[in-house]
Amino acid sequence: VTIIGANSPASLASRPIKVLLCDEVDRYPASAGTEGDPLLLAQKRQTTFWDKKTVIVSTPTIKGSSRIETEFQETTREEWNVPCPKCGHYQPLRWANIVFDRHDLKKGVRHKCERCGRESSEYAWKAQEIKGHFVAANPGAAARGFHLNTLASTFCGWQEVVEKFLLAKEMLDQGDPEKMKTWVNTELGETWEEPGERLEDTELVNRRE
């Protein structure tokens, strides 16, 4: 195992690589010194292996300049789907379907089924994880790609996600978008669109019960 920094052109060009793991690629510099794109430099080192493997992982950043967004669009674009506890319809857990009372979070956070429209608790949805599977939007692609948000995580509760959202929304209303940017990138696993493009009018920042 060899660990190399994305800003080190000499290291990137110094050895053949059969299995390449690129982590947090959205934070790579645009160029490794004067040598060019570090991701392309690293992939160039795999050309001698017919059975090479490449894994590219990242939290997304800014829409239009995100490396992982660009890479993901060229893949199978698979989303984790679980069945509705009420009707059995398979679907990804989406923020647009999260329901809560912002004035009384003790009432719990629920997810509304995209087909039957009925609401179920976090516990009910996560109990369905054992039946879950990935569904591809672009199954004919040569490379597989996967997207997960925090709603599907067994390590973080939905109430915590909502609390972070409400804090970020409060700061956004005061003119500071940084916490909301971080929330969108890290909790939803989505790219952030800069102010003036669409954010103020989306359901994202206007979630209500």
Where are these regions (language model features)?
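Short, flexible loop motifs at catalytic/binding sites
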Residues: 1-209
